[in-house]
Amino acid sequence: MGKKDEKSQQGEELVKVNKWDGSAVKHALDDAVKTCLLGDRPQLKEQFGLVNTRLALCALAVSVAIMAHAWDFTHPFPESRPVLLFSVLAYFALLGILTLHSSFREKGTFAVALQKDKERERLWEASSDMRKYDDKYLLTLSVRDTKNGKRREQSSNKSCAAFIDQNGIVLDNLVANEVNRLFNALAADKKNASSLSSN
């Protein structure tokens, strides 16, 4: 019974994607990386600052649109003209800020986690990129010291076929191996840096 339950549980955890859909493949691999990075490391606490900022900007834009609609309903045009003009400008300004935030701050980041210890705090980020009509999945794992701002990163650029089988099943163990390799490389650099500073 135990083996059957284990097999059924493994079957339920399998993620299958259309391997010809680049966007679906990227999101599935991102989810697998995030699960491995955060699920196996209790010392990493997930942070939602980037997501919350995006949600706040979207909420403000929607609020401006609702306010404009409500004002125009209670104060028909042309009385509502100044408010509508302000709302349109504010709406597109917020969308512009949201675009800049996504392009220059997020940069494909899908996981952010904070690691606290006695000496300092470190911020881990996982980001990815997969260009259209390209099978290469670029995964970047970075760590930044929140005190001195020093940032280090490790990258992996492999075909998505290295992590997905012929049936479109995401091979979590192979994803985990790659994530662990990048994480351990950064952790080793961190230990070397701390030992050098102590000497």
UniProtKB/Swiss-Prot annotation:
Residues 1-49, 105-199 are cytoplasmic. PANTHER family: MICROSOMAL SIGNAL PEPTIDASE 25 KDA SUBUNIT, SIGNAL PEPTIDASE COMPLEX SUBUNIT 2. The keyword Heme does not apply. Pfam families: SPC25. Component of the signal peptidase complex (SPC) which catalyzes the cleavage of N-terminal signal sequences from nascent proteins as they are translocated into the lumen of the endoplasmic reticulum. Enhances the enzymatic activity of SPC and facilitates the interactions between different components of the translocation site. InterPro entries: Spc2/SPCS2 (IPR009582). This is Signal peptidase complex subunit 2. The chain crosses the membrane at residues 50-72, 82-104. Keywords: Endoplasmic reticulum, Membrane, Transmembrane, Transmembrane helix. GO terms for biological process: protein targeting to ER; signal peptide processing. Component of the signal peptidase complex (SPC) composed of a catalytic subunit twr/SEC11 and three accessory subunits Spase12/SPCS1, Spase25/SPCS2 and Spase22-23/SPCS3. The complex induces a local thinning of the ER membrane which is used to measure the length of the signal peptide (SP) h-region of protein substrates. This ensures the selectivity of the complex towards h-regions shorter than 18-20 amino acids. It is a multi-pass membrane protein. Belongs to the SPCS2 family. It is found in: Endoplasmic reticulum membrane. Coiled coil: none annotated. Residues 73-81 are lumenal. The keyword Transmembrane applies. GO terms for cellular component: endomembrane system; signal peptidase complex.
